[in-house]
Curated annotation (Swiss-Prot):
Domain of life: Eukaryota
Name of the protein: Ribonuclease pancreatic
Family: Belongs to the pancreatic ribonuclease family.
Record-listed substrate binding positions: K7, R10, K41, P42, V43, B44, T45, K66, R85
Gene encoding the protein: RNASE1
Organism: Boselaphus tragocamelus (Nilgai)
Spans annotated as Disordered: 1-24
Amino acid sequence: KETAAAKFERQHMDSSTSSASSSNYCNQMMKSRSMTQNRCKPVBTFVHZSLABVQAVCSZKBVACKBGZTBCYZSYSTMSITBCRZTGSSKYPBCAYTTTZAKKHIIVACZGBPYVPVHFBASV
């Protein structure tokens, strides 16, 4: 079974590129990372930084998560991210996404030993 940490890496990490390569980036990535298998995942964010830098956020600024939980952390620095959002005309199994690049602080929830990101909460 996929661990929460491995799921975070599959759904949110793309260290191989510094930004989205094209407007088709989200359509390709959402499919290749298995987020369009049983339904179209409506929203997802990819982080274009090293895994070590993203894992380090777990020891950075302690903040509340959107759901009120307290295990969230905000990155001290901005990170290169790509937001993927399902389009209005998207219909499973033909999931379609808009690709939006940004530089923002990320907020992640962390757990475990080693203490690593398991949930992408928000970007600010």
